[in-house]
Curated annotation (Swiss-Prot):
Belongs to the DMRL synthase family. This is 6,7-dimethyl-8-ribityllumazine synthase. Pathway: Cofactor biosynthesis; riboflavin biosynthesis; riboflavin from 2-hydroxy-3-oxobutyl phosphate and 5-amino-6-(D-ribitylamino)uracil: step 1/2. GO terms for biological process: riboflavin biosynthetic process. HAMAP family: Lumazine_synth. (2S)-2-hydroxy-3-oxobutyl phosphate binds at residues 85-86, 127. GO terms for cellular component: cytosol; riboflavin synthase complex.
């Protein structure tokens, strides 16, 4: 029996990162966490490319453009959608989630969901490096594992 499982050491792999600028205070913390994880797992600076987009809604399109180039072994999507007093949150978070999943399935490149969808700013801050860890860091570790796993299969 053969079992496939990605490891967490990155050698010679390239990573694209897409970051939403809206709620930049949170996005920049997620990006810092992702970069920290990538570097700790052996990724060199010249193996990372970052694209900033206006907001979370634009993330799937740029992620798809990056994935279709086949330059990247994985694409990491980072940002924050924080609930307000209107239904806007529901529409944006739903479409971003579906869009990122579809990019991964359509391109067969791991596209990792590191977009926070929270009820308030406090929850976002907790998930961007305080009480609840850094979801950007976690997304980058997932990207490494998935890039390695797909290269094995």
């Amino acid at each position: 029996m053969r079992v496939y499982e990605g490891n967490l050491i990155s050698e010679g792999k390239k990573y694209g990162i897409v970051v939403g600028r809206f709620n930049e205070f949170i996005g920049s913390k997620l990006l810092s966490g992702a970069l920290d994880a990538l570097k700790r797992h052996g990724v060199k600076e010249d193996e990372i490319e970052i694209s900033w987009v206006p907001g979370a809604f634009e993330i799937p399109l740029v992620a798809k453009k990056m994935a279709k180039t086949k330059k990247y072994d994985s694409v990491i999507c980072l940002g924050a959608v924080i609930k307000g007093s209107t239904a806007h949150f529901d529409y944006v978070s739903s479409e971003v989630s579906k869009g990122i999943a579809n990019v991964s399935l359509d391109t067969e490149v791991p596209v990792i969901f590191g977009v926070l969808t929270t009820d308030n700013i406090e929850q976002a801050i907790e998930r961007a490096g305080t009480k609840a860890g850094n979801k950007g860091y976690e997304a980058a570790v997932t990207a490494i594992e998935m890039a390695n796993l797909l290269s094995e299969i």
